[in-house]
Every structure is written in structure tokens, then in C-alpha cells.
Amino acid sequence: MSPADLALLEPSLKRVALPLRMPLVTPDVPIEAVYFIEHGIASVVARTPTGQEAEIGFIGYEGMAGYSLVMDDDRSPLACYVQLEGEAMRIDAACFNAALAASPTLRLFLLRFVNYLQVQTGCTALVNARLRLAGRLARWLLMCDDRVVGIRFSITHEFLATMLGVRRPGVTVALQELEGLALIRSRRGEVVILDRPGLVALASGGYGVPEAEYSRLFGELDSAAQ
């Protein structure tokens, strides 16, 4: 983002905590604010009318929640909530829209992120259709690793099941498979990555395309850059 565009946003930005499960976007409700995530991870989630849900988008320090406003839409049918707690810079929707109106370059810059997220969502659809659960889990853990400082993070089997759109016993079996391959160590509520290259191999090409697109548009996607 250019210094001039950042200067448009800065007076209205406020640092806020992102507790676990905090809703950032509620489906079909006007978006109240945009969150530029600094630490933590948010999930973009699709829901059925009966309440079943699955993660279709994954946002960390590289992105923002409330991106529909960039496309001149004030709401989304998709939910977005915090899956790993952290912090964000929050700006009210009205102030954000005013900044977009004042600077065409700001909108163009943020549309790059929307493009990247579309690529990520497309790859999620591909791996959900073509990869075994263990490979899908490996990809998900790699995406977490890109956005979290350190090699361990707190996550429950139940939450992983929701994110991957599967039953909890399936997640347990997949975690055991990854642990048997010495790729991770799993304890109640915590996963530690032991062999990142091994996870990349198990993801069978499902990981890497969105990350390369992000690098092309913005630079390297790496938790060390936070």
C-alpha cells in the first residue's frame, strides 16, 4: 500500500483484540467494519440453511475481513470469524468507503487481495474434491504455519472438523496418520509441526498455487514477515 493511501486510513484505524470465534462478517447483514488482521487467523465460511458449514477462505496477517466493501457491496452471504485469536486494525465501514472514494489506487491495491483470495478459494474447492482428508489437513496446517509465528498452535479436533467439512472421527484418524508419518505431534487442543516439507509432499500439489499468486502480487507469504 502506498504511503498516501495508508495516510487516508490511519486516522480511522483502531487496534482491537480478536478473541476466538469473534464474528467479523455476519451473513446477509450490512458490514459494519473492515479488519486488517495483524496476528491470528480468520475463516471465511459457507453455511447451509440447516447450519452445516465449511471453511472456504483463510485470512491471516496478509489480508482483511470485510473485503466485499472493496467491490462496492455492503454485505456477503458468507460468514467470517476468528479461528485463531489475535489482533487487527479496525476501521468503520463508512470511513473505509470514504477512503476508497478518495483514492482509486487504494481500491485497485485491495482488489489484488480479493483476486488472491479467489485463487485460494478455487484451490480449496479442488483439494476438497480430489485429495484425501490427510492431504487436505496437511494443506490446512501449512496455511496455518504460514501465518502463525512458531511451529505450534492451539486447535481442537471439533474445530478442524468444521473447517474441513468432515466428521470429527475423520479428523482424529487423519491427525493420527500425519503423526504416524512423523509430520506433526498432536496433543489435546494443540498441533506441533515437525516436518514441513513432508506436509507439502502429502498435500500433493494442493498447497502452493495461492501462495505463489500472493508472492506475485505482494511478496513472500511467511509468518516471519509479521
Per-segment meaning from a language model:
Residues 4, 39, 94-95, 158, ...:
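Alpha-helix/helix-capping structural signal
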Residues 143-226:
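Phosphate-/nucleic-acid-contacting segments
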Residues 1, 37, 59-60, 83, ...:
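A conserved hydrophobic position in a structured secondary element of the catalytic/binding core
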Residues 22-84:
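Cyclic nucleotide-binding regulatory domains
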